[in-house]
Amino acid sequence: MAADPLPPSAMVQPGTLNLNNEVVKMRKEVKRIRVLVIRKLVRSVGRLKSKKGTEDALLKNQRRAQRLLEEIHAMKELKPDVVTKSALSDDINFEKTCKKPDSTATDRAVARLAGHPLLKKKIDVLKDAVQAFKDARQSAPAAESSESTSGEGRCKDIARSKDDARESQHPERTVVREQKAKDTNTAAKNAASGSKEKLAKTEQAPRAGTTPGSQGRPSGKGAGVNSEHQGAPAPGDSNQGKASTKTPEDSVCEPANNGVSEEEESEGEKEYFDDSTEERFYKQSSASEDSDSGDDFFIGKVRRTRKKESGVHSSAKELKPLPKVPSKTSTLETPWDVRNDKHRPIPEARKFESVFFHSLAGPKSSRRDPREQAPKNKAPDFPENEPPVKKQFTKSAYRGFESVKQTMQAPLHPSWEASRRRKEQQSKIAVFQGKKITFDD
């Protein structure tokens, strides 16, 4: 029996098949079919109970009605997913399950629901979709491999056909290509042979240049004559020496000239060494200064020590103290001068105030001049005049305190008045500190 096609909403794509989702979608259908089946079974139970006949027929009908009731209760307890999965896994036939002697009410209920025509259509469609999905997955690798091989074969065939068509249309081009290839091969061979000939000529030329020079040298002359010839060679000989390479005879004649050549080499090395190091640079710069001293080893050190000494002298010059200006306070003053200085006008008003000493916090007239304080250790000639000076300092401090009192006697806030009175009382009490106070005092 061929399965009817599903509507577009229920169609299953083989590429995106998820069986669990399909089972969940089937729950609604299973519940609707279960209601229809239960309604039908209830009607049949009522019919069986209403039948009349012999006692055996009545007992038989009662047993059938009891079975149907058990199936109805089993259907109510069944879950829709169990019905769908069992229908998808096996081909369930209701008649076969009923004929089994050990079949239970749940087995019969599942078989009855799965055998319903509406649910059976949906289950068949799902089975077909699952089978198509399996076939697609199995045939996909084989199809890809066959397509790839066929595509490669087609590309090769197309390329060959295009080449054949071009050759058939333009046969002259193929001939030109072949000729070009032959020309390139012959040119490469000619270039290789020409390079070999040039190398052979260059090898023969230096050999021909070296042999006449070696034959023309006299063998009987001593080492002194050879050294003279080497010391002052002719310009033509020098050019020949540059062009030709050294031969074994030249290398044999070299030990006779060691004396002159070693001196020249040592001079060249010394000049090179003088230019390359810092101490030799100092030596060249100080050659005019130290020309008398023949010892070259200590010249670099002398230059460094001179630099250090010059640096020390410059720093000492910078750190020289400035000439001291004699201060006015350093001169000795007598107490008589101090007394006379009192009446002099103060040159500059000083703005230093003390928090702890009232004598320093007073107005300008009551402040002490710093010159009033007689230096104790610098003026030891007048020891008998020290007590009057001290009394004078205490008097001036007391005057300053009184002037502060006068300035504070302006009308103030009550709290300020109270603090002022308290301070006055404290100043009076301070007189009696350390004494026994009697009633008369």
From Swiss-Prot:
Biased composition (Basic and acidic residues): 153-183, 269-282, 308-321, 366-381
One GO cellular component term noted in the UniProt record for this chain: perinuclear region of cytoplasm
Composition skew (Low complexity), residue ranges: 139-152
Keywords, alphabetical: Coiled coil, Cytoplasm, Isopeptide bond, Phosphoprotein, Transcription, Transcription regulation, Ubl conjugation
Tissue specificity remark: Highly expressed in heart, skeletal muscle, liver, kidney, testis and brain. Also expressed in white adipose tissue. Expression is up-regulated in cardiomyopathic heart.
Crosslinked residue numbers (Glycyl lysine isopeptide (Lys-Gly) (interchain with G-Cter in SUMO2)): K201, K328
Entry's localization field: Cytoplasm, Perinuclear region
Tagged with keyword Cell membrane: no
Compositional bias ranges of the Polar residues kind: 237-246
Stretches assigned to coiled coil: 52-77, 118-140
InterPro entries xrefs: Bud22/SRFB1, Bud22_dom
Positions of modified residues (Phosphoserine): S214, S276, S291, S293
Pfam families: BUD22
Cited function: May be involved in regulating transcriptional activation of cardiac genes during the aging process. May play a role in biosynthesis and/or processing of SLC2A4 in adipose cells.
PANTHER family xref list: SERUM RESPONSE FACTOR-BINDING, SERUM RESPONSE FACTOR-BINDING PROTEIN 1
Quaternary data: Interacts with SRF. Forms complexes with SRF and SRF cofactors ARID2, MYOCD and NKX2-5. Interacts with the N-terminus of SLC2A4.
Protein name, entry field: Serum response factor-binding protein 1
